Amino acid sequence: MRLLSALVGATLLAVLVPGAAWAEPPQALPANYTAADGKWQPAFDYDTDGCYPTPAISPSGAVATGLKNSGALNGQCRDQSDLDNTNSYSRSKCNNNWCAYLYDLYFEKDQAVAGWDCCGHRHDIEHVIVWVSGDQAQYVSTSAHGKYSTYLRSQVAWEGTHPKIVYHKDGLSTHCFRLAGASEQPENHYGTWQYPDLVSWDRFPAGVRDILVSANFGSASLAIKDGAFAYNLAQAKPSGIPFDPNA
């Protein structure tokens, strides 16, 4: 009886105490992007053992609080409604007849183990870079655990000009991006490749970008922000191309 009373009390506490409730993701920013950023935007899917991306910031400047890395791997972060309220953020640089288009996606948590997780963290931000020369994508780079893998265009599955990229759990480790298989079908609720509402670096609402790039996402970090952008381009740059990340 005491156990039952304790369980009932805990349930009531979770319902009645606002701090115990799951925070809803911020409202997405309206899509606002350059034609080039949109042309090369990745076509995304998200494996079932992880979260959907959500906005990192709202139009009013409210920053995502994320989720504790506990419970199910996709717990509280894989609702169909998340696909209808999400953003991707982009920034580009061109020189020496090459352009790099970098895309950031934010996820509320990154969890390696179901239940109590020792190795993941609140917040995850992953990145894709599309390398373009001669108005054709020549390489694609995907982020994983702070590093990049870079692939020839012939190794990449495409939907038009959009590389197909999947957010997945990397074995026993946490989540990252990978290339989609040539015949891979999307696993998200809609069963189609997803294009989160895109916001280019110079198209954020007034003041919102400054709040976003100053936000603390723990071990996760935006690659589009000053101080990180050139570093990420340098880490992922295909060998032998004349592109200068610091120009």
Where are these regions (language model features)?
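Secretory targeting and sorting signals
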Residues: 1-23
